[in-house]
Amino acid sequence: MQITVSGLPGSGTSTLSKLLAECYDLELISSGEIFRRMARERGMSLAEFGALAERDPSIDLDIDKNQKAIIHSRENIILESRLAGHMAQGRSDVIKIWIKAPLLTRVKRIQRREKTISFDEELKKTVERERSETLRYKNYYGIDITDLSIYDIVIDSEKWNQYQTLDILRVAIDALVGPE
């Protein structure tokens, strides 16, 4: 089984990917974690590293090339990243999930997780990060990140807690996969 989980920052992709990986005994590969680690290794914030990635396309291109290779060569994985679904486009055997939530909800979640700055600062930072990513994806691949038509499942994580959202996703995934 191969699953991609995508969504904007703070939508719950990391949490739900971990829960899905546990439920289905799948390996979790998170490009967001790779990106955050690369930023830390350079002593940069996510916003600073995102700005660097805007100037240095090799950062995104390397991460995305790696994602594409993974989704086309490995089984029993969950690939979690903003573009994971797009990296699996054309693969009907891969279950593509988009997790969504309103901006203010996402910013509250990020602020709670990061515990570093005020809500207004986090809002500004998140909007800038999303603007940066949207621009890069459009420039590099012609991808409109707001077009959700490639996804098999789109779910709003604001409506339910993480476990309720997981239960809904499991029912949908099991229906798509069929009996084992």
Swiss-Prot record:
The family database entries (Gene3D superfamilies) matched by this protein are listed as: P-loop containing nucleotide triphosphate hydrolases
A UniProt-annotated Pfam family: Cytidylate_kin2
The protein's predominant localisation is cytoplasm
Q: Name one GO biological process term.
A: pyrimidine nucleotide metabolic process
The organism sits in which domain of life?
Archaea
Q: Where does ATP bind?
A: G7, L8, P9, G10, S11, G12, T13, S14, T15
**What InterPro entries does this protein map onto?**
Cyt_kin_arch, Cytidylate_kinase_dom, P-loop_NTPase
Q: Which UniProt keywords apply?
A: ATP-binding, Cytoplasm, Kinase, Nucleotide-binding, Transferase
E.C. no: 2.7.4.25
Family as reported in the entry's similarity comment: Belongs to the cytidylate kinase family. Type 2 subfamily.
Identification of the protein by name: Cytidylate kinase
Query: What gene does this protein come from?
Result: cmk
